Amino acid sequence: MIAYIQGSITYKSPTQLIVDVGGIGYELQISLQTYDSLKDIAASCKIFTYLHITQDAHTLYGFSTIEEKQCFLQLLSVNGIGPRVAITILSALTPEALQQAIMTHDTITLQAVKGIGQKAAQRIILELQGKVGKVGNMLSLQPSGQEAIYQEALAALSKLGIHKSTAEKTVAAILKEHQGEITVESLIKLALKG
């Protein structure tokens, strides 16, 4: 999977972005939030990505922040929400506004998004209410700039058989305690001891 791409912007529209990486142009579908955060054409950028594979196409979705990507992935876990609907939701709501709407059971805010009716809004809240609190806590505990270390440690702990929610709490607590000044190896060792 492609975690992110870094290169120069060659084309930018409110829903699409083309980034030149080593002479190859990657086309990404983006939200309005990502569009607003990007600089002009020819500027260098780092875009977090999600590759969606279907029988007919391979589509890259791009996000300016790891938080936006995490919200996108959470939305994809909801029954009936595909990548196009998820990107539409993230175009209308920031990750923080989405998390707030889910935690406060605010169906009105979700229904304001084009294509989201009352049942879909209720389903999003029902299926994500437990997960978003964890994601929100994780994001507030996770020091900025440490996303790669955090994700790498979670992946390693998962492969070692540690339950995802336990690993998330443990890794976030260790990162908070060490204020981000820790290597991946030390983080994994401490998590296994804890």
Curated annotation (Swiss-Prot):
<dbReference type="InterPro" id="IPR036267">
    <property type="entry name" value="RuvA_C_sf"/>
</dbReference>
<dbReference type="GO" id="GO:0005524">
    <property type="term" value="F:ATP binding"/>
</dbReference>
<comment type="function">
    <text>The RuvA-RuvB-RuvC complex processes Holliday junction (HJ) DNA during genetic recombination and DNA repair, while the RuvA-RuvB complex plays an important role in the rescue of blocked DNA replication forks via replication fork reversal (RFR). RuvA specifically binds to HJ cruciform DNA, conferring on it an open structure. The RuvB hexamer acts as an ATP-dependent pump, pulling dsDNA into and through the RuvAB complex. HJ branch migration allows RuvC to scan DNA until it finds its consensus sequence, where it cleaves and resolves the cruciform DNA.</text>
</comment>
<protein>
    <recommendedName>
        <fullName>Holliday junction branch migration complex subunit RuvA</fullName>
    </recommendedName>
</protein>
<dbReference type="GO" id="GO:0006310">
    <property type="term" value="P:DNA recombination"/>
</dbReference>
<dbReference type="GO" id="GO:0048476">
    <property type="term" value="C:Holliday junction resolvase complex"/>
</dbReference>
<dbReference type="InterPro" id="IPR000085">
    <property type="entry name" value="RuvA"/>
</dbReference>
<comment type="similarity">
    <text>Belongs to the RuvA family.</text>
</comment>
<dbReference type="InterPro" id="IPR003583">
    <property type="entry name" value="Hlx-hairpin-Hlx_DNA-bd_motif"/>
</dbReference>
<dbReference type="Pfam" id="PF07499">
    <property type="entry name" value="RuvA_C"/>
</dbReference>
<dbReference type="GO" id="GO:0009378">
    <property type="term" value="F:four-way junction helicase activity"/>
</dbReference>
<dbReference type="InterPro" id="IPR012340">
    <property type="entry name" value="NA-bd_OB-fold"/>
</dbReference>
<comment type="subunit">
    <text>Homotetramer. Forms an RuvA(8)-RuvB(12)-Holliday junction (HJ) complex. HJ DNA is sandwiched between 2 RuvA tetramers; dsDNA enters through RuvA and exits via RuvB. An RuvB hexamer assembles on each DNA strand where it exits the tetramer. Each RuvB hexamer is contacted by two RuvA subunits (via domain III) on 2 adjacent RuvB subunits; this complex drives branch migration. In the full resolvosome a probable DNA-RuvA(4)-RuvB(12)-RuvC(2) complex forms which resolves the HJ.</text>
</comment>
<keyword id="KW-0234">DNA repair</keyword>
<dbReference type="GO" id="GO:0000400">
    <property type="term" value="F:four-way junction DNA binding"/>
</dbReference>
<keyword id="KW-0963">Cytoplasm</keyword>
<dbReference type="InterPro" id="IPR010994">
    <property type="entry name" value="RuvA_2-like"/>
</dbReference>
<dbReference type="Pfam" id="PF14520">
    <property type="entry name" value="HHH_5"/>
</dbReference>
<keyword id="KW-0238">DNA-binding</keyword>
<dbReference type="Pfam" id="PF01330">
    <property type="entry name" value="RuvA_N"/>
</dbReference>
<dbReference type="GO" id="GO:0006281">
    <property type="term" value="P:DNA repair"/>
</dbReference>
<keyword id="KW-0227">DNA damage</keyword>
<dbReference type="GO" id="GO:0009379">
    <property type="term" value="C:Holliday junction helicase complex"/>
</dbReference>
<feature type="region of interest" description="Domain II">
    <location>
        <begin position="65"/>
        <end position="143"/>
    </location>
</feature>
<feature type="region of interest" description="Flexible linker">
    <location>
        <begin position="144"/>
        <end position="150"/>
    </location>
</feature>
<dbReference type="InterPro" id="IPR013849">
    <property type="entry name" value="DNA_helicase_Holl-junc_RuvA_I"/>
</dbReference>
<feature type="region of interest" description="Domain I">
    <location>
        <begin position="1"/>
        <end position="64"/>
    </location>
</feature>
<dbReference type="InterPro" id="IPR011114">
    <property type="entry name" value="RuvA_C"/>
</dbReference>
<dbReference type="GO" id="GO:0005737">
    <property type="term" value="C:cytoplasm"/>
</dbReference>
<keyword id="KW-0233">DNA recombination</keyword>
<feature type="region of interest" description="Domain III">
    <location>
        <begin position="150"/>
        <end position="194"/>
    </location>
</feature>
